[in-house]
Amino acid sequence: MVYEDLFRKLSRELMRNLSEVISVTKQDLGNPDNKFTRNLLPNSLCDFYTIFSYLAFDWEARELSVDGEKLHGRINILKAEQVLGDWEGIVYFKNISHYESIEKFKVVDFFADEACVGFISDDRSLDYLEYLDFGETETQPLGLTFEGYYELMMMARGFWYWQRVILNLRNGKGYENNVEQFKIYMPQIFPDFKWEDFVALYERVRIK
């Protein structure tokens, strides 16, 4: 039960062991959901919904900040019914030019007001997650199943824009500022975090 075990571990760590370093501003999870349509969702996401129907977790560093903003993290895995809903007006706009695949994009982790992670709802892309900055006309492949994404998300503790670190690892470039902040501040907030372990986990779970 990788989904439940990893979340319980994260919850215990943030709520107890690190209470002097961070504050948990939101923790919410739903009971299992067995009413979703399996053939419309990635396989490993279906496995998640048999454990939780949704998962929301926000934390904020008590002292550490960058450019006047406290360091924080967010996990926001949506309910299946929300994922499969209509994302016009959020992900894409009819009157703005975009790739046709954007209209098939379904948001899974709505971790920021300006960005998210999801999948393109056609047979070719099932169990393969994509990153999207709102306002962009196409997505960026993460090269991860939802299960692999979840494992990395838990190790990253939902650190703000940790997904861009994955894009940098996958492409060998881009988002250098996000990578630098991640490497500097993660060990300061979470003493057991090691960059080398994160990279090793990425290499293990990425789609090859």
Name every feature range the model reports, one short phrase each.
Residues 1-115, 204-208:
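A surface-exposed partner-binding patch
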Residues 3-7, 143-147, 159, 175, ...:
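Alpha-helix initiation and N-capping motif
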Residues 14-21, 25, 153, 157, ...:
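Short, flexible helical or helix-coil boundary motifs
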Residues 20-29, 62, 159-170, 199:
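Short glycine-rich, low-complexity/disordered patches
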Residues 102, 124-127:
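A short, compositionally biased
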Residues 115-122:
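Short, surface-exposed beta-strand/loop micro-motifs that present aromatic residues
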Residues 128-162:
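Compact, glycine/acidic-enriched structural inserts
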Residues 169-208:
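Charge-dense, low-complexity intrinsically disordered regions
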